[in-house]
A protein has these predicted regions:
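Terminal, non-catalytic protein-protein interaction segments that mediate quaternary/complex assembly
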Residues: 1-133
Length: 133
């Protein structure tokens, strides 16, 4: 859970913010993993609704157009790969909201897209499945 918050809430690329040694081998002297993970989520872009980073955009879209199939993030940015100390394994997430007919409850669905390597941590294979709103 700490890694999720480090990337999605703090939008950080500095391992010192994580307080874990899992990422040490990819960090430089200052603790940075380069333009990877949280760094990419924190880059602000201009939208007609204003400046937002990817996380802010997901939250905006979930609030204003929750049934869209186009609510997603992507941190595998080709032009920045040479400045990442490691390429992202979990590189994209797609979100949508569903509602069962006749029920009030909404369900947030989140799909994690990930590249698999020989040694994948079991907790990474299915990070998020369904949350109730």
């Amino acid at each position: 859970m700490d890694e999720i918050l480090w990337i999605w809430q703090q939008k950080s690329n500095n391992i010192h913010d994580l307080h874990s040694h899992i990422w040490d081998s990819w960090a430089d002297e200052e603790g940075s993993i380069g333009k990877a993970y949280g760094y990419q989520l924190g880059i602000k872009h201009q939208y007609k609704e204003g400046m937002m980073d990817q996380v802010d955009r997901v939250l905006f879209d979930l609030k204003n157009n929750p049934y869209s199939r186009r609510i997603m993030t992507n941190i595998y940015v080709h032009q920045d790969l040479h400045e990442m100390n490691l390429y992202p394994c979990a590189y994209s997430m797609t979100f949508n909201v569903t509602k069962e007919p006749g029920k009030e409850k909404l369900t947030l669905n989140a799909i994690l897209n990930q590249r698999f390597y020989r040694a994948v941590r079991p907790a990474d294979s299915i990070l998020v499945s369904r949350f109730s709103l």
